[in-house]
Amino acid sequence: MEQHPLLTDIKYLNVPNICFSLTEETDNREPIYSEQRQLRGFDDSETWSLTDTICLFILPRLQRFKEINASTPAQLTEKEWNDILDKIIISLQLTCKDRGLRIWTEEESKQINEGLDLFREWFMALWW
């Protein structure tokens, strides 16, 4: 017996932070996107604003990483590392705060750029 698509489609499992689909259940493309999610775990709508999709995926994981992280890069103090992580987290929060509108103050733009530069610089240190 075949399961109803809503029972096998990750979008409708009510599990947070695993599906970033931008379609509504009533969207006429939803059957196609549902099939994509079942086949590969995401649908094409997640690429409409990949910036937001990536931010929404990384942000809660980075916040949790900071909470449970058991190490610090050798050249940094714990405070320095936490300050770097905070700046990266703030940049991601600001980047995805308006769901793609990209309306930031000059100060917010500076914070985003600083945090993303730090993310690039310290990306390989995000492990423990």
Enumerate the language-model features and the residues they cover.
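Long, non-globular targeting/processing and low-complexity regions
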Residues: 1-128
